[in-house]
């Protein structure tokens, strides 16, 4: 593991650690896809990860545009966060993942395990706390399921029943997204699972100030990355060199369009 990877292996988001990492990579993360890097970087997190890993640069319109070495469910959550959070939070939360995406792809069993973790963590750590905060009478059954460590499927079915209750629209929509994610999990569509789980997160993002939901989402992304294969180990000097060279290339640059949607 390179120094850059070790620096954030514990996912420290202190101002000192983030500042040190930003100075090393010197790369600005932006929303959307981009045909070429600019003098400040200026790409999404997945495009920056291409550069860091030494791949030829390409605009990333969907996770299918990434090399096979990128885990699809991991890349999907990174893409969704990249295109949703505000600039300052994007830099803080996602820049540490630039050196951790290439080489993360694993077999289907592992990828499904990652997708399941992302969905279950979304339900347990983000959706259920929001429902508990609402103090709806129908939550007693859901709390019992959570307390006895019920399966993701049981939790999703309970959420589906809650979506027909008299809850605020944001919560009912989030419950539906979680249930849809469970349906995708049963069909073994790991990328679709993550996309639906993220839609549930996004519905709830306005419930807590200062982007707290997305901070939890980045923590879930880190947990998923700890399952299975890890990023390729390379010298930090090589990674920094690649990032610098990409910024120096005299190529025209314009922002390419990308809409946050599921593309299988």
Give a label for each model feature.
Residues 2-264:
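Short, glycine-biased loop/turn motifs at secondary-structure junctions and
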């Amino acid at each position: 593991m390179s120094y850059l990877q070790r620096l954030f292996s514990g996912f420290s988001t202190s101002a000192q650690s983030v500042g040190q990492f930003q100075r090393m990579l010197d790369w600005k993360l932006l929303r959307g896809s981009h045909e070429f890097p600019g003098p400040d970087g200026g790409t999404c997190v997945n495009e920056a990860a291409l550069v860091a890993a030494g791949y030829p640069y390409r605009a990333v319109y969907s996770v299918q545009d990434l090399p096979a070495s990128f885990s699809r469910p991991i890349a999907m959550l990174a893409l969704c966060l990249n295109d949703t959070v505000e600039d300052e939070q994007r830099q803080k939360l996602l820049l540490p993942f630039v050196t951790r995406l290439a080489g993360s792809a694993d077999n289907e069993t592992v990828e499904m395990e990652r997708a399941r973790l992302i969905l279950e963590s979304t339900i347990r750590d983000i959706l259920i706390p929001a429902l508990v905060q609402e103090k709806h009478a129908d939550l007693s059954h859901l709390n019992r399921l959570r307390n006895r460590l019920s399966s993701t499927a049981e939790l999703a079915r309970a959420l589906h029943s809650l979506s027909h209750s008299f809850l605020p629209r944001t919560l009912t929509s989030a419950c539906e997204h979680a249930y849809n994610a469970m349906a995708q999990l049963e069909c073994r569509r790991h990328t679709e699972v993550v996309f639906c789980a993220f839609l549930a997160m996004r519905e709830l993002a306005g419930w807590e100030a200062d982007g707290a939901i997305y901070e939890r989402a980045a923590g879930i992304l880190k947990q998923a990355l700890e399952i299975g294969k890890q990023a390729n180990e390379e010298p930090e000097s090589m990674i920094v060199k690649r990032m610098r060279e990409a910024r120096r290339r005299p190529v025209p640059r314009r922002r390419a369009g990308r809409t946050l949607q599921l593309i299988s």
